[in-house]
């Protein structure tokens, strides 16, 4: 339930209108979070910058970033982000079979070692409290360099 009515682009401060339009372009509809964050332009700008940073880093494939975001959305039960990231995964090259198997990644043979390690990290980061075991981190270090791990954590966060 939305308790703060999102600002429409024409109601928002001039300095954040391009940010709202960019968010709307990504989703194809008005972004509720961008419209709400527009009440406080520094928050909207920081949020958009953090969201864009992993895409600009390019240490990881767009497909892996979309898959881990989809898994995180599944864990927190967010239908909008599940659908949005499924579409992003499809655009970035994931097969329909792979997208459908994300929730059952542990028993699926369709995922690479890197993808499975990333899914382990997603699950560790989305528990309360977050608990990334030495085993999970050691496995990441075997498959990813430090830059990739930082990008992966930022993508999941």
Describe the predicted segments one by one:
Residues 1-157:
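Hydrophobic alpha-helical segments
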């Amino acid at each position: 339930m939305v308790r703060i009515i999102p600002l429409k682009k024409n109601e928002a401060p001039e300095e954040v209108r391009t940010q709202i339009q960019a968010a709307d372009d990504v989703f194809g509809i008005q972004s509720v979070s961008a419209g709400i964050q527009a009440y406080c332009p520094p928050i909207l700008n920081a949020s958009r910058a953090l969201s864009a940073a992993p895409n600009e880093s390019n240490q990881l494939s767009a497909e892996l970033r979309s898959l881990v975001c989809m898994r995180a959305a599944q864990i927190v039960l967010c239908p909008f982000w599940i659908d949005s990231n499924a579409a992003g995964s499809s655009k970035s090259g994931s097969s329909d079979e792979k997208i459908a198997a994300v929730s059952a990644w542990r028993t699926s043979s369709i995922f690479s070692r890197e993808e499975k390690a990333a899914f382990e990290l997603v699950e560790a980061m989305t528990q309360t409290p977050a608990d990334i075991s030495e085993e999970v981190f050691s496995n990441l270090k075997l498959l990813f360099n430090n830059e990739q791990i930082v990008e992966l954590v930022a993508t999941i966060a």
